[in-house]
């Protein structure tokens, strides 16, 4: 208004003052049609109250009951006087504020990388390894916060925040199984891969039934050998794997704010794993096991940070309407792994990117560590083709890790093809901006 530009206001009769020459319009926030972090922020109803996300969690802090008043000169009959100056005034906007841990530059880089990587259904999340702060989280598809009704009939679940939702994860869970083995002194375990193996009468194949030959833990991670991890799982036993998974945070929800809670996922029970075939499936992240992208990122933080992680958090501080600020910090790290296991796994996952099937994730100017995954879902399209969740999760730089990044795509081809290049683009963008 101060720029002299025309503004169209949609008002109802209840919003017109009883004083005939004053028009009162409530002050509402309005988001751009391409708002970053839309699933985190949420959207408002027609009265300006938050319905989802941060807007709902902190509605009592963010809602404004202020109004803009337009005084319009009128004659004795209530008709506006042509050419008269309109006087615009507004009430003091009495609202608080919520400061998130999101870094806008990183968030924008993630949003762009997802779209550039053609991830139409999926997500990406970036976590600061030092303290667990969520620096970026983007989900696809998005919805328009100003025209929510346009997306209500969509079959692709545009309102679902995939960063906090659980999915079949596949081979990226091999990182947790490898951690369980290292914690128990099995880093020297080897086996012969012939492209497939039979356990409990069920045949499990490696990708394209490739025979990897004699494989140790480092090589098994590089080529993502199912046969190796199936045999390793049988040697470890179900309890060892589930105990390590629990230490890394799998099967546990995380509350970021009131109503913003990540799904706990599903860790199979001891009863569900009491057959060799069920344990074999679990050993490479298949079967009933599910986890959220934020849980995968949390696991990678532990690997990168000497075996410790801080639970991911999203809200840095809240200032209420009286001006009182409350800050939130992560001061209590969880010790999940030994420093020695962390060091060895970091070296192995760096080799996955340098020499293995994660090479398409390699950043331009520094090293990274990570793991691919292509997870079967048991869901088929109309042509009978199984839809897979594809993943890449990693951290960088390998020698002094700062960020953990996880990308997931629904209906993808492979983690190496779909998600690893997106990781590389995000890592390069963050390095350039800093």
Give the residues covered by each predicted segment:
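Carboxylate/His-rich catalytic cores and anion/metal-binding grooves
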Residues: 55-75, 117-137, 241
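Small/polar-residue-rich segments within soluble enzyme cores
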Residues: 1-95, 407
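Short beta-strands and strand-coil junctions in structured, solvent-facing domains, enriched
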Residues: 108, 413-414
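Short, gly/Ser/Thr-rich active-site loops of penicillin-recognizing serine hydrolases
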Residues: 325-330, 421-434
């Amino acid at each position: 208004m101060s720029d002299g530009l025309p503004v169209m206001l949609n008002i109802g009769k209840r919003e017109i003052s009883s004083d005939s020459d004053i028009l009162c319009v409530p002050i509402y926030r309005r988001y751009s049609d391409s708002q970053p972090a839309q699933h985190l922020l949420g959207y408002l109803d027609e009265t300006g109250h938050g319905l989802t996300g941060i807007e709902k969690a902190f509605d009592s802090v963010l809602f404004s009951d202020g109004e803009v008043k337009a005084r319009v000169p009128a004659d004795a009959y209530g008709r506006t006087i042509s050419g008269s100056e309109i006087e615009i005034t507004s009430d003091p906007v009495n609202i608080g504020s919520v400061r998130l841990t999101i870094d806008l530059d990183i968030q924008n880089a993630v949003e762009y990388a997802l779209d550039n990587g053609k991830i139409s259904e999926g997500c990406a999340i970036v976590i600061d390894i030092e303290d667990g702060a969520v620096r970026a989280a983007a989900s696809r598809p998005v919805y328009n916060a100003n025209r929510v009704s346009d997306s209500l009939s969509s079959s692709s679940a545009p309102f679902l925040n995939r960063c906090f939702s659980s999915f079949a994860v596949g081979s990226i869970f091999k990182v947790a199984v490898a951690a369980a083995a290292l914690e128990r002194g099995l880093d020297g375990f080897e086996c012969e891969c012939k492209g497939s193996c039979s356990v409990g009468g069920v045949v499990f194949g490696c990708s394209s039934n490739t025979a990897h030959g004699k494989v140790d833990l480092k090589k098994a991670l590089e080529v993502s050998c199912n046969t190796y991890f199936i045999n390793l799982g049988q040697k470890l036993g179900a309890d060892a794997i589930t105990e390590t998974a629990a230490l890394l945070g799998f099967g546990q929800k995380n509350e970021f704010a009131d109503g913003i809670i990540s799904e706990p996922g599903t860790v199979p029970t001891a009863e569900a794993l009491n057959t060799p075939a069920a344990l074999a499936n679990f050993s490479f992240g298949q079967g009933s096991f599910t986890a959220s992208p934020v849980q995968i990122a949390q696991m990678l933080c532990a690997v990168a940070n000497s075996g410790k992680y801080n639970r991911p958090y999203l809200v840095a501080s809240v200032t209420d309407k009286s001006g009182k600020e409350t800050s939130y910090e992560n001061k209590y790290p969880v010790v999940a792994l030994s420093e020695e296991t962390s060091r060895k796994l970091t070296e192995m996952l760096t080799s996955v990117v340098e020499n293995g099937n994660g090479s398409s994730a390699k950043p331009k100017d520094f090293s990274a560590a990570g793991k691919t995954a292509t997870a079967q879902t048991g869901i088929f399209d109309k042509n009978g083709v199984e839809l897979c969740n594809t993943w890449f999760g990693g951290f960088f730089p390998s020698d002094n890790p700062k960020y953990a990044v996880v990308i997931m795509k629904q209906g993808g081809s492979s983690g190496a093809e779909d998600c690893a290049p997106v990781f590389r683009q995000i890592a390069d963008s963050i390095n350039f901006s800093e």
